[in-house]
Amino acid sequence: MTNIRKSHPLIKILNNSFIDLPTPVNISSWWNFGSLLGACLIIQILTGLFLAMHYTSDTLTAFSSVTHICRDVNYGWIIRYLHANGASMFFLCLYAHIGRGIYYGSYLYPETWNIGIVLLLTVMATAFMGYVLPWGQMSFWGATVITNLLSAIPYIGTNLVEWVWGGFSVDKATLTRFFALHFILPFIVTALVMVHLLFLHETGSNNPTGLISDSDKIPFHPYYSVKDLLGLFLLILVLLLLTLFSPDMLGDPDNYTPANPLNTPPHIKPEWYFLFRYAILRSIPNKLGGVLALVLSILILALLPLLHTSKQRSLSFRPLSQCLFWILVADLITLTWIGGQPVEHPYIIIGQLASILYFSIILIFMPIAGLIENHLLKW
């Protein structure tokens, strides 16, 4: 008799994705982040669902409904902070996942990579809208500043902004639609994740050497399911430590003040995971130029398969490119720091130099380093 997990139409899909999936024997812990992102998504959907049961998307009651969740709802405080800090863990895993993709040349699976970029944009949109919902000062002014960027689009910009706002300023209509979109987007993300996995399982996973590993594969379960479980325990440990000991560490104190359109905070800034994008946006004094730089800083990832000049896939055996990769990481950390600083000397010039370096490394230095390495190896 055939095993049910290999014959049942539904269970067969799960079996081929998580149990009998042929996996390269040599993938490292950097490959854990995919499953950790799945875990983060589940945590966010569950905690978000319980929060939505008590939240009201009205400008008069939104702030007090979040306070009510923390004070009066059973375990509301932990659900709220798991959700808020879960977003930080989500982006931490997301950036590690993208970094691993760049380091080991996973972008050479273009379908998987491009769906990944769409996923990144969708998750960023979801997180931005979620930040608006508590209706604190930073929520309101963050929404005002970021949605206002659409007005930089020539000809249709102003109409587009008012269409997004649902009026002539960020108000009740904006909050209501942001709540509706914030609720639906994680389910769209889940659907995109399935497409992402579908394309990944068409080609199979990459591995640290960047070589074809068809001849040397092992089943995903129990080898990697156990390894992923360890990563999951560590993720939950860090999330709980953050939530229980310093839940507000990554938040902004201004968001504990109810939104007031008549009082602008001295320094408007997004959550930490958007700070490096925000620094790139601010580094160009022109509004349209800044918006273009912001969009290109994300869409530049789609060019990576075209910019790959090396005859080796991974950076494992390419010291020049390795150096550039870690300079890029340091540059992104610098941009994150700059994004949180006020717009004054010397932060302005540091931000501009770091932004130029970001684009230069990806568009110029990495492709040249690949060609030099080919030449040194006489390939």
Swiss-Prot record:
SUPFAM superfamilies: a domain/subunit of cytochrome bc1 complex (Ubiquinol-cytochrome c reductase) (SSF81648), Transmembrane di-heme cytochromes (SSF81342). GO terms for cellular component: mitochondrial inner membrane; respiratory chain complex III. InterPro entries: Cyt_b/b6_C (IPR005798), Cyt_b/b6_C_sf (IPR036150), Cyt_b/b6_N (IPR005797), Cytb/b6-like_sf (IPR027387), Cytochrome_b (IPR030689), Cytochrome_b_C_euk/bac (IPR048260), Cytochrome_b_N_euk/bac (IPR048259), Di-haem_cyt_TM (IPR016174). Its cofactor is heme b. It is found in: Mitochondrion inner membrane. It is a multi-pass membrane protein. Heme b b566 binds at H97, H196. One of its GO terms (biological process) is mitochondrial electron transport, ubiquinol to cytochrome c. It holds the Pfam family Cytochrom_B_C. Heme b b562 binds at H83, H182. Signal peptide: none annotated. A ubiquinone binds at H201. Binds 2 heme b groups non-covalently. Keywords: Electron transport, Heme, Iron, Membrane, Metal-binding, Mitochondrion, Mitochondrion inner membrane, Respiratory chain, Transmembrane, Transmembrane helix, Transport, Ubiquinone. Coiled coil: none annotated. GO terms for molecular function: metal ion binding; ubiquinol-cytochrome-c reductase activity. Belongs to the cytochrome b family. This is Cytochrome b.
